[in-house]
Design a protein with these regions (language model features):
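Hydrolase active-site cap/lid region
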Residues: 183-239
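Catalytic histidine-centered segment of alpha/beta-hydrolase-like enzymes
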Residues: 292-302
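Short beta-strand/loop motif that positions the catalytic acidic residue
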Residues: 252-254, 259-261, 265
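Short alpha-helix in the alpha/beta-hydrolase fold that links the catalytic acid
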Residues: 116, 246, 255, 269-278
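Conserved acidic catalytic loop of the alpha/beta-hydrolase fold
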Residues: 152-168
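Membrane-embedded segments
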Residues: 74-157
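Acidic catalytic loop of the alpha/beta-hydrolase fold
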Residues: 263-268, 295-296
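An N-terminal hydrophobic leader/cap segment in hydrolases
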Residues: 14-73
Length: 315
């Protein structure tokens, strides 16, 4: 009996060690900056491949050096990097929002949002601001924050945009940037100059996204690994994966929101957009793009996308 008890205790200890080790691995695999190989130059190359109609504008922007970069300092001392581009002085717009804050996705960088920069700047006549999120691009940080900590950095960028341009603004994000946008939207201290939000293929929560990827990539259930990993992350960074909830923040959002999602998205699965849309209690629109996978709605429907956003931003 004593030998059986000792054997059981050893097995339990080994299981705990295995789970803790797996949790550290998951944190490192999914969220450590050191695994990001994406660069700004790769982003420019992908833009040329996916959005060739924007190249004349982008080449002009780069050749003339009018895309300005800047750094700001967060309250905790982190340096955050971003780009901005003023609207053409003679470019008229009917949009109520004259400035767009454009937020990139997971393991991307600010330059990845230049296709929407083209849409807002060239097609809609807006100023644009494109931040590098925490642990992305030229911003400080070693671990990706899945939008939750990023929402507070985005709030800083909204204030920077207001100090630069003094105009009403729209916040528009893609993928993790869309989750950041939605998480920002429920903050109590939103700047009054934010008039609209646009989220394109964002997830309901960090928990839901990780649970799906754990199943898809490793064929593992959420329990117990994801629960333990979330606790580990909380000890490291002060928030859990369930706390990082876009759906709870959207329910508090007082501003109009446009929801966009590809109906063939299996990375942030399409089903997520429905509870998000339902949670928003104010003015809202939902647009599903037919046959589109993750984050490619503007790529395959550029005219319709531009028209949808233009119509949404009408006063």
């Amino acid at each position: 009996m004593k030998k059986i008890l000792i054997s059981c205790l050893i097995c339990i200890c080994l299981l705990v060690v295995l789970l803790v080790g797996a949790s550290f691995y998951m944190v490192d695999y999914a969220l450590a900056r050191r695994h990001t190989t994406w660069t700004e130059e790769k982003a420019w190359q992908r833009l040329e491949e996916y959005y060739p109609w924007t190249m004349e504008w982008m080449d002009s922007i780069r050749a003339n050096g009018v895309l300005k970069d800047t750094f700001i300092v967060a309250e905790d001392g982190r340096r955050l990097h971003g780009y901005y581009l003023p609207r053409y002085p003679k470019h008229d717009t009917v949009s109520v929002a004259r400035t767009a804050l454009l937020i990139h996705g997971y393991r991307n960088c600010a330059i990845d949002m230049m296709h929407l920069g083209y849409m807002y700047h060239h097609s809609l006549g807006c100023n644009i601001v494109l931040p590098d999120l925490h642990a992305h691009g030229q911003s400080d940080g070693e671990s990706i924050q899945m939008g939750w900590k990023d929402r507070l950095d985005a709030l800083l960028w909204c204030r920077v945009a207001d100090s630069l341009f003094h105009t009403p603004m729209v916040v528009h994000g893609i993928s993790m940037g869309a989750a950041t946008t939605m998480m920002l939207s429920g903050e109590e201290n939103l700047p009054t100059n934010i008039t609209h939000f646009v989220e394109d293929c964002g997830y309901t929560s960090a928990w839901d996204e990780f649970r799906g990827e754990l199943s898809n990539q490793f064929s593992l259930p959420a329990f117990p690994l994801l629960h333990l990993t979330s606790r580990l992350w909380d000890a490291m960074y002060g928030w859990t994966f369930t706390e990082a909830s876009a759906i709870k923040q959207v329910a508090r959002c007082p501003k109009p929101m446009l929801f966009i999602h590809g109906d063939a998205d299996d990375f942030v699965p399409t089903w997520m957009v429905y509870p998000l849309h339902e949670a928003h209690q104010g003015q809202k629109q939902l647009w599903l793009t037919e046959g589109v996978d993750h984050a490619h709605s503007y790529r395959y429907y550029p005219d319709e996308y531009t028209g949808m956003v233009r119509q949404f931003l009408l006063p």
